[in-house]
């Protein structure tokens, strides 16, 4: 496959608006390829490509290829993602025209093979770890190429064509296609059953990740994860709990709502101290993974420890959106019980410690959660309830189906009942529509609240609904703050 894309080849992305597809399109465009793409609606990621793409279509219809032909593009390479169904009219037309069709993972695998590469996999923390890794490398002058599932603050984009020797890629495990990646260094952050629409059980996930690991020249794993520790052999490991058994480790000295201070160890010896402007033990683990990868690539330690002090989270990872009626609104991508628990724990640390990277220290936590997929909600119903009960108050949005058909009886009201079984006194409110959601937040929030919107769907529109629809007060927007 390494020689399959010639410089003059035009590449057309069906579903260009997705975070992973747009990153690939951006990099290919910056490498000089002619690109085009389509999606059902114009997304911010597509808007960023408007000046770089030959054509962008706000519909996925067969006539898009006729338009390309009118522009002199006869045989484009067509790229699709798992999200594109076999019934998609544009895909059907590409098949009728007998065009070459690649899955998104084929294109990413090709990019990974073109230069020394680091692929970041795992159930949780992939985006943050790959963003931190990219940022550290950029800060010390390495300028990596990056294909990330979130916006990297130092580049302001999810895709970047660097001039350095390394490529950093986020390796999504959701459909198992990461087994195609042959990276110079693979990282696995943790393993926990998710994406039950693809994986039958945990053993199925473990075998897929083992195949990914075997395909990498070197493998770096999280020694604190019990599944990785038991089932995987690796070239190196990291920990935020143990020094003696890890090649790279950080032991927390101070955990506050606005920062983390930890002693940093390599091969059992303390070699420095980390001052991290990101709260939460899970963020410390992500940063140590990135540090370990940099060190395995020969980056000097002193420059890295200095770079750590300037880190910021990727977009939609505890992303401060602004203030509304003396309430601070934060957006987070958490959509699995473990992610929800880690995010709520970090938010409560800000409330309880009186220290926060936000403009003002919040006094109470109002969580707004949008379950993602009916199958995931059904599979992890009790785990979601156990995680969400730690909020001071809770508003639930309708389930975001992400293309799934509804499952009878599986809805946000069922989740609310499960939460009330754990704590009958928990204030929990259920919105029947997204339009109703902002009204419930207005009704049940209070000044000095941290309004934390969590989910992988469109719950991130809550800020716009609060600030633009003028329901009850003025709103002000501030730059995203790392957390």
Swiss-Prot record:
Sequence positions that bind ATP: 122-128
Gene3D superfamilies: Mur ligase, C-terminal domain, Mur-like, catalytic domain, NAD(P)-binding Rossmann-like Domain
EC number: 6.3.2.8
InterPro entries: Mur-like_cat_sf, Mur_ligase_C, Mur_ligase_C_dom_sf, Mur_ligase_cen, Mur_ligase_N, MurCDEF_pg_biosynth, UDP-N-AcMur_Ala_ligase_MurC
Catalytic reactions of this protein: UDP-N-acetyl-alpha-D-muramate + L-alanine + ATP = UDP-N-acetyl-alpha-D-muramoyl-L-alanine + ADP + phosphate + H(+)
GO cellular component, as recorded: cytoplasm
Subcellular location: Cytoplasm
UniProt entry keywords in alphabetical sequence: ATP-binding, Cell cycle, Cell division, Cell shape, Cell wall biogenesis/degradation, Cytoplasm, Ligase, Nucleotide-binding, Peptidoglycan synthesis
Keyword Cell division set for record: yes
Xref: NCBIfam families: murC
Family (UniProt): Belongs to the MurCDEF family.
Function comment: Cell wall formation.
Name used for this protein in its record: UDP-N-acetylmuramate--L-alanine ligase
Origin species: Synechococcus sp. (strain CC9311)
Gene symbol of the encoding locus: murC
């Amino acid at each position: 496959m390494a020689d399959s894309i010639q410089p003059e080849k035009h590449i057309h992305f069906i579903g260009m608006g997705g975070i992973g597809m747009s990153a690939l399109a951006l990099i290919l465009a910056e490498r000089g390829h002619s690109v085009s793409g389509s999606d059902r609606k114009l997304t911010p990621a597509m808007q960023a490509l408007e000046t770089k793409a030959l054509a962008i279509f706000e519909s996925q219809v067969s006539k898009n290829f006729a338009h390309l032909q009118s522009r002199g593009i006869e045989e484009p390479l067509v790229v699709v993602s798992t999200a594109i169904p076999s019934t998609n009219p544009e895909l059907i037309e590409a098949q009728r025209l007998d065009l070459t069709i690649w899955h998104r993972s084929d294109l990413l695998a090709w990019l990974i093979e073109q230069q020394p590469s680091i692929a970041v996999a795992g159930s949780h923390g992939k985006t943050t770890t790959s963003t931190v890794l990219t940022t550290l490398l950029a800060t010390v002058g390495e300028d990596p190429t990056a294909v990330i599932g979130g916006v990297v603050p130092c580049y302001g984009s999810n895709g970047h064509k660097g001039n350095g020797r390394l490529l950093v890629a986020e390796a999504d495990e959701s459909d198992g296609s990461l087994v195609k990646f042959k990276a110079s260094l693979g990282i696995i952050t943790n393993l926990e059953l998710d994406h039950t629409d693809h994986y039958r059980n945990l053993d199925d996930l473990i075998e897929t990740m083992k195949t990914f690991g075997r395909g990498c020249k070197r493998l770096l794993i999280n020694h604190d994860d019990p599944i990785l520790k038991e089932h995987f052999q690796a070239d190196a490991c990291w920990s935020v709990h143990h020094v003696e058994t890890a090649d790279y480790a950080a032991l927390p000295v101070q955990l506050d709502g606005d920062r983390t201070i930890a002693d940093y160890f390599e091969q059992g010896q303390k070699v420095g101290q980390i001052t991290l402007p990101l709260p939460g033990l899970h963020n410390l683990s992500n940063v140590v993974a990135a540090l370990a990868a940099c060190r395995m690539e020969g980056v000097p330690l002193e420059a890295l420890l200095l770079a750590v002090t300037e880190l910021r989270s990727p977009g939609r990872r505890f992303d401060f959106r602004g203030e509304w009626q003396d309430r601070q609104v934060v957006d987070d991508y958490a959509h699995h019980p473990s992610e929800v628990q880690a995010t709520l724990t970090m938010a409560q640390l800000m409330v309880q410690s009186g220290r926060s990277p936000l403009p003002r220290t919040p006094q109470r936590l109002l969580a707004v959660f949008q379950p993602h997929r009916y199958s995931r909600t059904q599979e992890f119903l009790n785990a979601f309830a156990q995680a969400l009960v730690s909020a001071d108050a809770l508003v639930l949005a309708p389930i975001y189906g992400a293309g799934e058909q509804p499952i009878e009886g599986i809805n946000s009201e069922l989740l609310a009942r499960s939460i009330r079984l754990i704590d009958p006194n928990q204030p929990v409110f259920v919105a029947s529509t997204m339009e109703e959601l902002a009204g419930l937040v207005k009704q049940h929030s209070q000044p000095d609240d941290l309004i934390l919107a969590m989910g992988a769907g469109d719950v991130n529109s809550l800020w716009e609904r609060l600030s633009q629809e003028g329901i009850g007060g003025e709103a002000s927007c501030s730059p995203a703050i790392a957390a």
